[in-house]
Design a protein with these regions (language model features):
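Short, low-complexity disordered leader/linker segments with a strong preference
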Residues: 1-30, 328-331
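Secondary-structure end/capping motifs
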Residues: 229-311
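Alpha-helical structural context
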Residues: 155-156, 200, 264, 307
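Conserved C-terminal helix/tail region of periplasmic/extracytoplasmic solute-binding proteins
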Residues: 300-331
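Soluble non-cytosolic domains of exported or imported proteins
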Residues: 66-70, 85, 139, 143-144, ...
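Pocket-lining segment of extracytoplasmic ligand-binding domains
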Residues: 90, 171-265
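Residues within well-ordered alpha helices
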Residues: 47, 53, 152, 196, ...
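Short, glycine-/small- and polar/acidic-enriched structural segments
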Residues: 29-161, 165-169, 178, 185-191, ...
Length: 331
């Protein structure tokens, strides 16, 4: 009789363990994330992946390249992706078009511009007024890089419309190749391209747009309002994983960060990744928490307005949800 009871208890325990395992397995949820471009600038996102922070939260991330703000928004609005990593200006453009299901910024990843000014010739004692009379190969009109670029030029007394020849009709993916082929005296580039050009003697980094522009919600995670309502727990878990990664990046060296994200940049030498990470850490480009505050939001709209690209002024609370980030941080 005792043997039978023991067998029953053992069987029940097995069933319980199996059920819990099955239950845990079913809780893993796939989240499709579209990134506007693939860049070391987004290091905390790759740390969240490589260090298993998303996995700890029961999330499986399907990371997709959407390449361009307009394409990223199209993918999000058409349910091709669940969450977008893109500049906050895109949410304002969508809102201004009368969207019935607005796109909400819920977790900030980068807090400065991520581009650098690269000159074709080596420049001694660089000053911004040296751009006057030059040909400047900028970024796509209406995107954050171009708007920040114009904002910084104006800040230093250089009118991008009259003081230089501004080229901004080249596709994002082709800008670096255009400069390498001989177009422009100066170009605005992301890393690691800027450092690669410097190593190869194709250009020289002379200034940082991130240092000059101040804090701005340059790249944030956003999703449709309806997705947050229907998947609030998923968004909370996602934000928690990002916050863990942000603190990890903040407390680890550039070398350690480079080693963590290297699998996502197989064609980039590890020492170059480290150089780029150090540069971004030094200028405070990586947000240390996911909260997009009102001051940053207003700075964004000032930059958009100065560039003539702000379709309508939008209050912080309309397109920004800080409740989720604040809740995660307070845990």
């Amino acid at each position: 009789m005792r043997l039978i009871k023991s067998s029953i208890v053992l069987f029940a325990t097995f069933i319980l363990i199996f059920s819990l395992a099955a239950c845990g397995k079913s809780e893993v949820q796939k989240v499709r994330v579209g990134e506007v471009t693939h860049s070391i600038f987004y290091a905390p996102q790759y740390v969240a992946l490589s260090e298993g922070f998303f996995e700890e939260e029961g999330l499986e991330i399907d990371l997709q390249g959407t390449f361009g703000g307009d394409k990223t928004m199209t993918a999000l609005l058409s349910d091709g992706i669940d969450i977008a990593l893109v500049g906050s200006e895109t949410s304002i453009y969508v809102y201004a078009q009368g969207a019935t299901d607005p796109v909400i910024n819920f977790a900030q990843l980068t807090q400065t511009d991520g581009t650098f000014l690269v000159s074709r010739e080596k420049v001694e004692n660089f000053s911004w007024d040296q751009l006057k009379g030059s040909t400047f190969l900028g970024q796509r009109k209406g995107g954050m890089p171009q708007m920040v670029g114009e904002f910084v030029l104006n800040k230093h007394g250089v009118d991008p419309q009259t003081d230089l020849e501004l080229i901004q009709n080249i596709e994002f993916a082709n800008i670096a190749n255009a400069f390498a082929s001989g177009t422009g005296d100066y170009v605005q580039l992301f890393e690691p391209t800027a450092s690669i050009f410097e190593q190869e003697g194709k250009g020289h980094i002379v200034a940082s747009f991130g240092k000059e522009s101040g804090h701005v919600p340059y790249t944030t995670f956003m999703t449709k309002e309806s997705y947050i309502k229907e998947n609030k727990e998923v968004v909370e878990k996602f934000t928690r994983a990002i916050y863990k990664a942000q603190k990890w990046v903040e407390t680890h060296s550039a070398k350690e960060v480079a080693e963590s994200i290297a699998p996502y940049f197989e064609d980039t030498p590890i020492d170059l990744i480290e150089t780029v990470v150090e540069r971004y850490k030094e200028q405070g480009s990586f947000a240390t928490d996911p909260i997009l505050d009102e001051e940053e939001w207003n700075n964004l709209q000032t930059i958009m307005d100065d560039a003539g690209e702000l379709p309508t002024d939008v209050e912080h609370g309309i397109l920004v949800n800080t409740d989720i980030a604040e809740s995660v941080i307070s845990e």
